[in-house]
């Protein structure tokens, strides 16, 4: 049994290579390839928070409801660094803004300010929402 797991366990190096390829595809504006690679990564490694974040961010434009689900799922993760929590909440705020749910976008941005009272992005985003 252990031999089977060891032999078929996803290689961390392979996952990181795929992640770098996905980031490169994003830089080259190959959204389709980036989404495919990121999807492959999260299927192999459900703990790869950065891959989930980037996948949701890429999906926001064409499939914002799916982006919301991905980013919501990340909010329940325990023991994340403060910076990662802020990044997740920011992405979720932008997702809600994309679908026109300004109240939920505001709530998520306010959560950012609860974590970091001087967060410039959250303050600017809340001002932008108030002006809509």
Label the predicted regions.
Residues 1-17, 111-115, 120-125:
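Long, contiguous interaction/recruitment modules in multidomain scaffold/adaptor proteins
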């Amino acid at each position: 049994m252990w031999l089977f797991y060891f032999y078929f366990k996803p290689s961390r190096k392979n996952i990181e290579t795929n992640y770098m390829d996905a980031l490169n595809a994003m830089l080259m504006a190959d959204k389709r390839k980036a989404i495919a690679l990121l999807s492959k990564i999260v299927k192999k490694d459900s703990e790869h928070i950065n891959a989930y974040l980037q996948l949701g961010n890429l999906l926001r434009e064409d499939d914002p409801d799916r982006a919301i689900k991905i980013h919501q799922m990340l909010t329940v993760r325990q023991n994340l660094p403060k910076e990662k929590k802020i990044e997740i909440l920011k992405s979720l705020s932008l997702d809600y803004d994309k679908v026109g749910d300004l109240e939920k976008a505001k709530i998520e941005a306010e959560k950012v300010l609860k974590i970091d009272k001087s967060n410039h992005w959250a303050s600017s985003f809340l001002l932008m929402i108030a002006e809509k």
